[in-house]
Amino acid sequence: MSGACSSYVSAEQEVVRGFSCPLPGGEAAAVFCCGFRDHKYCCDDPHSFFPYEHNYMWWLSIGALVGLSTAAVVLLAFLITACVLCYLFISSKPQTKLDPGLSLQTTGSKEMSPDHHGLNTAIPMEVPGVSSPRQSSSSNTHLESNKKQTVSPTCLPQNQFMATVTASNIPGSPDEISVPTPGPHGPVP
């Protein structure tokens, strides 16, 4: 680079005449012409691109490095936390499939095939004092014939249901589940 800056048109569209470096009243060490096509100035470093002191640029660079490194650390911590939580979630799941509980099946007199033995089976049970769905038509006629009878407040009509008990091969589970028998007037409050 030389010490002579040619004329140029500034960003404000003003024509600036050429000048030689160093400028009168300027720094004696600024012997080079630096800058861009729309802004030229005298400088002491021919590879300088901005008319700022180097200290300002170093602080800007250090701030950018600190900001980027902080962002990288936060992102890395987030990724590690997500991976650890996924690992803990997957490793804490039980390896065997558990029995979901009572199964809803229609009651009937179907025999089970031999390949279904040992699996969860629904055993229809009749609870004393409660009629099954198959007996609902006969109980409706019985209720219609007794419409004129008075019902005591302790003996209210009850819904009809069929209890289904699921048996499974889980170690430690009871083989039989006892079903409480309600009294003649229903459960005691």
Curated annotation (Swiss-Prot):
The chain crosses the membrane at residues 48-68, 70-90. Residues 140-171 have a biased composition (Polar residues). It comes from the Eukaryota. The keyword Transmembrane applies. It is a multi-pass membrane protein. Its main location: membrane. One of its GO terms (cellular component) is membrane. Pfam families: Shisa_N. It is found in: Membrane. Residues 98-189 are annotated as: Disordered. InterPro entries: Shisa, Shisa_N. Keywords: Membrane, Transmembrane, Transmembrane helix. Belongs to the shisa family. This is Protein shisa-like-2A. The gene is Shisal2a.
